Amino acid sequence: MDYESKYFKWLGYEETVRLQKEISEKIIKEDAFKNLRYVGGVDTSSIEDKIAGVIVVLEFNTLEVLEVSIEISQVNFPYIPGFLSFREGPIILKAWENLKIKPDLLIFDGQGIAHPRRLGIASHVGYVLDVPSIGCAKKILVGVYKEPDKKRGSFEYIYIDNEIVGAVVRTKDNVKPVFVSLGHKISLSTSIEIILKTSTKYRLPEPVRLAHIYSKKALNFEIKGELL
């Protein structure tokens, strides 16, 4: 199937919004998986007209890195807030296709349903791939919340019009929180548990932290011929 033309093609503002709303109604907001052996971290980086998409596959219990898939291509879509998945989704799909080990769950550096139309990149790509997914962002896109306590594991819910769409989660004592929302085929409570389990030494969960590092290095090497 040509996923890019079906799910990530710009159709004009109104039609693209309609597509987002249509897909968002199909998002599964409960745990729809049994075993969790492999987890994937997903991130992209862009410089000038190049974009790198990375998926890092780790063993869930040990967080041992098993595989890294990197794809680099031309940027074919401008940066438009609320439509990030149309810019980054296609390169992530290419990275997914090249994986020998397919993760049981993906953690994205970005939003899940904590999005104006409840379809951030974690939800959009998770739905297209039919894979459980979580959004874990460094900044909030939309919604209101109270600051959680300073202790690791503390969290407060994110609300949009009195609807719970995510949680602000403290992954380290006295460090800025992350913004967690379910992506697809997972509950918010399980999403929070997994983010805390995979956040060991740093603010960001290890799969996402590593994906970010690899995407930056890959793009720097592609453009400048040197590693960071």
UniProtKB/Swiss-Prot annotation:
Q: Which Gene3D superfamilies match?
A: archaeoglobus fulgidus dsm 4304 superfamily
Which InterPro entries does the entry mention? Answer: Endonuclease-V
Disulfide pairings = none
Q: Which GO terms describe its molecular function?
A: deoxyribonuclease V activity; magnesium ion binding; RNA endonuclease activity, producing 5'-phosphomonoesters; single-stranded RNA binding
Q: Which residues are annotated as site, described as Interaction with target DNA?
A: 79
Q: What's the main place this protein lives?
A: cytoplasm
Gene Ontology CC: one annotated term: cytoplasm
Q: Which domain of life is it from?
A: Bacteria
* A single BP term in Gene Ontology: DNA repair
Reactions the enzyme catalyzes? Endonucleolytic cleavage at apurinic or apyrimidinic sites to products with a 5'-phosphate
Which residues are involved in binding Mg(2+)? 43, 109
EC numbers on record:
3.1.21.7
Compartments, record wording? Cytoplasm
Q: Which UniProt keywords apply?
A: Cytoplasm, DNA damage, DNA repair, Endonuclease, Hydrolase, Magnesium, Metal-binding, Nuclease
Cofactor entry: Mg(2+)
- Top EC category: hydrolase
Summarizing the function annotation, the protein's role is: DNA repair enzyme involved in the repair of deaminated bases. Selectively cleaves double-stranded DNA at the second phosphodiester bond 3' to a deoxyinosine leaving behind the intact lesion on the nicked DNA.
**UniProt cross-references to NCBIfam families, sorted A to Z:** PRK11617.1
Family label: Belongs to the endonuclease V family.
- Write down the PANTHER family for this protein, in alphabetical order: ENDONUCLEASE V
Q: What's the protein name?
A: Endonuclease V
Species whose genome carries this gene: Dictyoglomus thermophilum (strain ATCC 35947 / DSM 3960 / H-6-12)
Gene behind this protein: nfi
